[in-house]
Amino acid sequence: MSERKLFTSESVSEGHPDKIADQISDAILDAILAEDPDAHVAAETAVYTGSVHVFGEVSTTAYVDINRVVRDTIAEIGYNNAEYGFAAESVGVHPSLIEQSPDIAQGVNESLEVRGTGDQDSLDLIGAGDQGLMFGFAIDETPEFMPLPVSLSHKLVKKLADLRKSGEISYLRPDAKSQVTVEYDENDQPVRVDTVVISTQHDPEATNDQIRQDVIEKVIKAVIPAEYLDEDTKFFINPTGRFVIGGPQGDSGLTGRKIIVDTYGGYSRHGGGAFSGKDATKVDRSASYAARYIAKNIVAAGLAKKAEVQLAYAIGVANPVSVRVDTFGTATVAERKLESAVRDLFDLRPAGIIQMLDLKRPIYRQTAAYGHMGRTDVDLPWEKLDKVDALKAAVEA
């Protein structure tokens, strides 16, 4: 009998405290970019019972009503009832955004390449907003080229939110978490779902039996393909027995604490940088998107079954200090050819990434819940497959 291998990933709903913080940070970023596409923004948010603190650094000509953006975001998520201990129109909002450090700004606004040579290549002008390493990943086990465990985890909490907002399950509250364990065969192909864990906040009147039945029938079976479920699949639904107190009343939340949920569910490596609240000069965000774009096009081109792209930068320097492609032995061509093709086809300077993916637009709030990668419900430029033919041609040359 072949060895059984399990892999687990999780997701959280838009009403989870950390995701509330992410969405507020990205809503502020979008509001600023809508007025000033060249703004530099690093907006952090902390939420807890009855209170929201927004802090960080900005450089912009825009005026944004932070108080209104915060309240509108909370309302859209679904915190409109004082019984939740956190409601859009009654929370205290405490903004404290200051001007970006001139020491950082000088390296971002004029890269080392420009300062050193005096050349005026417009794509050399912007230096990386910080040092760091970023990863992008793709795999052929789902139509969206994402690992199955995190893909299913996102879809489960998104389905819970849809049922809550439509009123079909009226007792649901905004906070929820999911976790999916997938069994893989000896060829690393997913064959079944071993375990599903869902914890969902609810009104006090809802019974455990009712919650379990609704979640299994209306959420799990509606999301997970029947061929992955069998009589041995285990369901843990609200395993603590009660989840009435949730959201910021139950736990404080901070921007950037769900970086594995935001990416690949632990299936791929992560450089450690968070995304939300950061404009595209911050390579933590933009280079992670570029790396995903590259990896997805490599796999979609049939050049590998899975691909991980690492990029690394020095603060104030436009060109990446390293580019690496790892296909884990699944490539149909030499990895050095893939790396050469990537360098030729993708401009990985910050300004090049911004131009390539059109990242000065207010598109970020929609990424701040249910994953930044592999989304099929929203149109994100790093998910496009417009480099497939060019990659094929480049490796054949």
UniProtKB/Swiss-Prot annotation:
Catalytic activity: L-methionine + ATP + H2O = S-adenosyl-L-methionine + phosphate + diphosphate
One Pfam family, short name: S-AdoMet_synt_N
Biological process, per Gene Ontology: one-carbon metabolic process; S-adenosylmethionine biosynthetic process
Residues at which Mg(2+) binds: 18
Cofactor binding comment, as recorded: Binds 2 divalent ions per subunit. Binds 1 potassium ion per subunit.
GO MF annotation: an example: ATP binding
Subunit structure: Homotetramer; dimer of dimers.
Protein name per its UniProtKB record: S-adenosylmethionine synthase
Organism (species): Streptococcus thermophilus (strain ATCC BAA-250 / LMG 18311)
Designated gene of the protein: metK
